[in-house]
Amino acid sequence: MTLDEFNRLPPEQAREALLACAHVGRWADEVTAGRPYASVEDAARAALDAADPWTDEEVDAALARHPRIGERARGESADASMSRSEQAGVDTSDDDVTRRLAEGNRAYEERFGHVFLIRAAGRSAEEILEQLTERLGNDAETERANAARNLREIAALRLKGTLSA
């Protein structure tokens, strides 16, 4: 949809479009209430501002909607489609990469209690594996901040993509 179309949507429909970007109700409400936006960049900036900070509960809600890196999101929802597009650069045809991602995902989830989240768009599988390995050495507080930062980046990129369609 275009920015103009987004600006004119009824609030409930704008909120639904935003929830596909990040499943955080307060955030979607705040970005919806900020309309109309003069540019896609203004909308993305408002999305980043509304997401900083997100509460632990909001981060958990958004993380619950993200598949593991290297696993394709299932279903036909807008957020599943966005996730598949974002992970398109992760080559899962290489068995070694797939194995290393699966092992890293398991280790990460055991250590931190949630999926490993990274802005996958524009990153290779090797870059993602490098970050996964590095972030496994973080303490829980640092990693929570990393997850929240990546969620904010993903939400803003998804919104830009939605409003550029």
Predicted regions mapped to residue ranges:
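Aromatic-anchored, charged helix-turn/loop surface patch used as a conserved interaction hotspot
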Residues: 1-21, 25-107, 153-165
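C-terminal non-catalytic interaction appendages of large macromolecular assemblies
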Residues: 93-165
